[in-house]
Amino acid sequence: MTIQLINESSNTAKFQQICEKWQLVHDKSASLALVLTDTRLELRKLDEAKLGAIAVNFVDGTLAHRRKFGGGRGEAIAKAVGIKGNYLPSVIDATAGLGRDAFVLAAIGCKVTLVERHPVIAALLEDGLTRAYLDAEIGEFMQQRMQLANVHNIAQLDTTTQSADVVYLDPMYPHKQKSALVKKEMRVFQHLVGADLDADQFLLPAKALATKRVVVKRPDYAPPLAEQHPSFSQKTKNHRFDIYLSPLQKR
């Protein structure tokens, strides 16, 4: 991974702390840049400035609108993880990305542990969470329900002490569309990390951690993860959720 590290803020110590924590090294020839401004940490694709910057923002914008006016319990992901009545499962989001799916679940009431293996994305996610924790409206429930795990792979979680009702997987999968048709965040992500070619390896540790079910989000054209057919699937317009029930749930 190559990336430029740029500090546009007045807080040099914070910038250095981010670089050291996530073990990031500056490469002046890279076309992607991680930039700290006075308000947030953001990712820019320098050779495609029109794409704009990518940052994690739980407080306002799209996610705030989705929290206030979205489908809530009617959202496809809420149904997939099994939210029903008073039942709000604990969830490990093993491919957290920018935390959007996790935020939907947390806003409904689930406690979500986030795991993100790419250091740049994890840094963006941590920055977004830190700002959300300080917000007067959502700060309290965010601190209670959304936490970034101090690991970069779910295989590093202890199955005896860090299990959850549900493990959620949404691995990057190659898009059929030409790049110009793929939304900007996905284009930048693919440039940064590519597809999760080792995604099949996620399923076994996910099953070990999930006490009730593993939920895998897949494009409608993608095969099942690790060629293991799910217990059942829930389909949406362009995707499906493959659901693997734990042995105890099948009885």
Swiss-Prot record:
Write one Pfam family the protein is assigned to: SAM_MT
Query: Catalytic activity annotated for this protein?
Result: guanosine(1516) in 16S rRNA + S-adenosyl-L-methionine = N(2)-methylguanosine(1516) in 16S rRNA + S-adenosyl-L-homocysteine + H(+)
Q: Which GO terms describe its cellular component?
A: cytoplasm
Q: Which UniProt keywords apply?
A: Cytoplasm, Methyltransferase, rRNA processing, S-adenosyl-L-methionine, Transferase
Q: What superkingdom heads the lineage?
A: Bacteria
UniProt-listed InterPro entries = 16SrRNA_methylTrfase_J (IPR007536), SAM-dependent_MTases_sf (IPR029063)
What GO molecular functions are on record for this protein? rRNA (guanine-N2-)-methyltransferase activity
EC number of this enzyme: 2.1.1.242
Q: What class of enzyme is it?
A: transferase
Instruction: Tell me where in or outside the cell this protein is found.
Output: Cytoplasm
Residues of the signal peptide: none
Annotated S-adenosyl-L-methionine binding lies at R100, D101, E116, R117, D170
Q: What protein family is recorded? A: Belongs to the methyltransferase superfamily. RsmJ family.
Q: Briefly, what is this protein's role?
A: Specifically methylates the guanosine in position 1516 of 16S rRNA.
**Protein name from the UniProt record:** Ribosomal RNA small subunit methyltransferase J
Task: Say which species the protein is native to.
Answer: Haemophilus ducreyi (strain 35000HP / ATCC 700724)
The encoding gene is rsmJ
